[in-house]
Amino acid sequence: MILRKKFGGIQEMYNIVSKLLIYGNMDEESILMQLSDIFRCMDEGSQTKDVLRTRVFKQVKRILEVATDYAFDKNLWHNYLTYLLITNENPFSITCEKVGASEGSVNHFAKSDFKAFKELFDFDFSRIEDELGVDCFSRISDYQAIGKPELMYNKNVSEKVQALSERLETAKDENEFFDMVTDFYKAYGVGMFGLNKAFRIEECGDNNIRFRAINNMDKVVLSDLVGYEIQKQKLVENTEAFVEGRKANNVLLFGDSGTGKSTSIKAIVNEYYDQGLRMIEIYKHQFKDLSNVIAQIKNRNYRFIIYMDDLSFEEFEIEYKFLKAVIEGGVETKPENILIYATSNRRHLIKETWNDRSDVENSNGMHRSDTMEEKLSLVNRFGVTINYSKPSQKEYFEIVFELARKAGIKMGEDELKLEANKWELSHGGISGRTAQQFINHLMGLQA
């Protein structure tokens, strides 16, 4: 049957949401917009109970899906609203990211929106539940989530959303709401870049790209990398200058495979995330999109490392030209909030051939030595180059001893040496990676 009776207060959610100005840029298919429309239809009596109940269940299911993705617990409605607030990129929130709120007329509009969100936080669903004969909103207001392994969700996002949600529950009015939300923007930022440490890029047609968060980045820190203290210190000094707004250089980490080059960069991102450092991993075939990537991040209040792993070029590859163009810059000044950190097994990045060494002119009238110089000059565009060389056998054993100690492996040094030596002979030779794989093997045996 069609509901003809007007239920006082039910349309209130629609009225609240319709007042949003700065945060009103939500898609019509978003959960909040759909719920507000459901309650409007209910108040107008334009749909049957069965239709309204089905629509309500659909949106509650979507809230549960968001909660599952981020391992939300307790009040899922509050968690969802908080998630909206800290992922909504608008002129106000972006201005506040990493610097906080400033005096200005926009604060009046923001507080008006936060008053609406405060009303949504306190929204009473009981009348709707009574009329439709459901209890789903009561259930998600005190939800007991099933425990999930960390690899199945983004723990960083989960913890931040739930912590802010619990704070917002205590806000007395829109002024306290304003302070709490803008404090969050100052501490972490807003949207995808505020909540995540690292990203990859994806092509999405028409020469456009979008960023995809890396949800479960390795939690490694620099102290986990045994040895290489000089190398780590050089990387730290350059990165600290960068995040503090001082002059810093692009960095090339080169050397033997398995020596900790990639691990060092991941560790740097983990250690300086709270200071606004973010990483965007880009592959060689995506270098054509570099200018597009830079255009999308240059005006954000973060420090971005564009990370290129295992960087090298064969003689016939020309992608290095895109990289050189970005590093050198053109008419436009290179943004100060972007650096390139790359790893490579090659010191000069581009394979040099005997033809390159010849000074015979090619068909284009250029000396081959000029071509070689153009290729090899790429490495000079990195202001800091750090050599990660293969450890000596003594250093290899020291790495094994330290990793064994951290792992709680009870084995004498002589036996460790003997077994570690056997392992490296059949597993690719001496390196930090080989040492870690050996320790993983021992840990598996102990289990």
Segments from the language model and where they lie:
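Intrinsically disordered, low-complexity N-terminal extensions of AAA+/P-loop NTPases
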Residues: M1-E166
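Interdomain "pre-motor" coupling segment immediately N-terminal to P-loop NTPase/helicase cores
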Residues: A145-F211
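N-terminal pre-Walker A segment at the start of P-loop NTPase domains
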Residues: R212-E240
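Walker A/P-loop nucleotide-binding motif
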Residues: R246-I265
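AAA+/P-loop NTPase substrate/partner-engagement loops
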Residues: E271-F304, L311-F316
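Conserved catalytic/switch belt of AAA+ P-loop NTPases
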Residues: E315-N364
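Conserved AAA+ ATPase "SRH/arginine-finger" region at the nucleotide-binding site
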Residues: E361-L376, G383-F397
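C-terminal alpha-helical "lid" subdomain
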Residues: T385, S389-A447
